[in-house]
Amino acid sequence: MYKFETHLHTSNCSACAVSSGYDMVDAAKEKGYSGFVVTNHFYHGNTCVDRNLSWESFIAAYCEDYEITRDYGEKMGIQVFFGIEEGFAPGKEMLIYGISPEILTAHPEFIMFGAKEKAEFIHRMGGVTVCAHPFRSRSYIPNPDKEPDISLFDGIEGYNYCNAPEENEKALAFAKKNGLFATSGGDVHNSKNFGNAGIEFETQIKD
């Protein structure tokens, strides 16, 4: 079996992360994972990247830590894939998979899109959208019990290591009720917490 973490942040790109990409690769190796997806906070999230940069420079800076992590992963036998976590409302975030840095660079209008436009764009580009940590109850999140708009998402993060058990139970039930696939993510910010979630595949994945 091939195990992958689906939700992970690195400290040089996500302001809330503690560990570097190097530490994350080492942790993946130690815990017996095949790889992970780097889903750093994007433009409308808790990013370290200067939003005053030109769009092209912003994307280059945003992707730099992913690229460093990917290259180190190759040396260590750990696959590292590119993803995004983008905010679309207070405390509400979208995990995006299957979109390349080149696509982002070519579409500066992406930062102006609302949630629906973002989802439609991702789908046109062949990507996948997943609702991150639904039903999460935090002081900064208004209406935590509000159900996700299923028109925006292909899947739901049914298990998030940082969510309470009852929040994950609601997420899984929501995914099942609405015919959406469910993912499992560690929402890893510290390499010490690597290994508490993920998805297993029977065959090696390429992208």
Predicted regions and their residues:
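Active-site flanking residues adjacent to catalytic metal/cofactor-binding acidic residues
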Residues: 6, 39, 84, 132, ...
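Extended substrate/RNA-proximal surfaces in nucleic-acid metabolism proteins
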Residues: 42-157, 162-163, 205
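A short helix->loop->beta-strand "cap" motif at the edges of active sites that frequently abuts
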Residues: 33, 78, 178-180
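Catalytic domains of carbohydrate-active enzymes, especially glycoside hydrolases
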Residues: 23-39
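Structural motif
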Residues: 2-4, 35, 128
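Charged catalytic cores and adjacent phosphate/nucleic-acid-binding surfaces used
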Residues: 1-11, 20-26, 90-106, 120, ...
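Ser/Thr-glycine-rich phosphate-binding loops at phosphate-binding pockets of nucleotides
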Residues: 10-11, 35-47
